[in-house]
Amino acid sequence: MKIKVCGITRLEDAAMVTELGASIVGVVLDELSPRHASHNTIREIAEAGITVAGVYTSEQTVLSSPLFEDYVQLHFDHDPELIRSIHELGRKVISVINFNGIRDLKIKYNAYREADIILVEYKKGVSSIVSQIAPLGLNVGYAGGISDRDIENIIAAKPSIIDVSSSLESSPGIKHPGKVMSFFKKIRDAMDYVS
């Protein structure tokens, strides 16, 4: 299972979470987000050898991006053609589905199946719906309200990736070392327990 830590705004936080076990760090490029960072932040992280995802909220911002990142995370409704176009540019794709019921989820899952990772997000807490989404596929991950309190339930569902952000912060965009260390320890403990 991979772990993505999102909302990264500084190289030092990207390095810290990677050293502790994150597989991917996410940089939000939406200027309206309190966790907004720039393409230069992505480039700096990528040049440090850290796997990074740029998080986009519109197709227009993807198409105008220099794409310094390893993964392009599409946090908006999109079609399979955009996924293919990004693959043609040599980048991997994370397609996000905001959970709005199982029927909608299955429709979007089928539309996004060419993505490298399909991330199901549920802001109210994805752990409350894992039983509904666990059977979807091998490339499905979870996001939304994940913290060290529900990590055993999440890991037991065997997602390909989990995505965490605000539960590891001291303030928006700034990761708290103690919270990060505690979270990764809980993950290791839960994985030992589940396996």
Swiss-Prot record:
Pathway noted in the entry: Amino-acid biosynthesis; L-tryptophan biosynthesis; L-tryptophan from chorismate: step 3/5
GO process annotations (BP): L-tryptophan biosynthetic process
UniProt keywords, alphabetically: Amino-acid biosynthesis, Aromatic amino acid biosynthesis, Isomerase, Tryptophan biosynthesis
A GO molecular-function annotation: phosphoribosylanthranilate isomerase activity
Reaction equations catalysed: N-(5-phospho-beta-D-ribosyl)anthranilate = 1-(2-carboxyphenylamino)-1-deoxy-D-ribulose 5-phosphate
Keyword Amino-acid biosynthesis: yes
Its EC number(s): 5.3.1.24
Family: Belongs to the TrpF family.
Full protein name: N-(5'-phosphoribosyl)anthranilate isomerase
Gene name per UniProt: trpF
